[in-house]
Amino acid sequence: MAIVGLGTDIVEIERISAHVARSGDKLAKRVLTEAEFEIYQQHSQPSRYLAKRFAAKEAAAKALGTGIGRGVSFQHIHIGNTPDGAPTIDFTEGAQQRLTLLNGVVGHISIADEKSYAIATVILESR
């Protein structure tokens, strides 16, 4: 296997909280898939959840080499969790097409947060 993409992003959680306070769920609906949005709505810390997902998707888009736009949408990247809580990443539509162009077959993701920041790193591998 070879690394075909690497991306990292960091988000200030308060910035996301302020946006949610100003605009309600507008950002969440733009960034999160339906399944992610359901979790967001019931989460004990929704702004923290949204910040982590935002960082994860930005990191994934950077690993794909496109950023958000140029055929890759936030909606084309789904961040989930294993039963043990480890984060997972799945690509659809434009993100999957870009991954295929890179000969990528698997994505690895790490997400962390502290009081003020959420950070994510994505590594894409080929076979």
UniProtKB/Swiss-Prot annotation:
Compartment annotation: Cytoplasm
One Gene Ontology term of the molecular function aspect: holo-[acyl-carrier-protein] synthase activity
SUPFAM superfamilies in the record: 4'-phosphopantetheinyl transferase
Record keywords: Cytoplasm, Fatty acid biosynthesis, Fatty acid metabolism, Lipid biosynthesis, Lipid metabolism, Magnesium, Metal-binding, Transferase
Domain of life: Bacteria
InterPro entries assigned to the protein according to its UniProt record, in alphabetical order: 4-PPantetheinyl_Trfase_dom, 4-PPantetheinyl_Trfase_dom_sf, ACPS, Ppantetheine-prot_Trfase_dom
NCBIfam families xref list: acpS, pantethn_trn
Protein name: Holo-[acyl-carrier-protein] synthase
Origin species: Shewanella oneidensis (strain ATCC 700550 / JCM 31522 / CIP 106686 / LMG 19005 / NCIMB 14063 / MR-1)
Gene: acpS
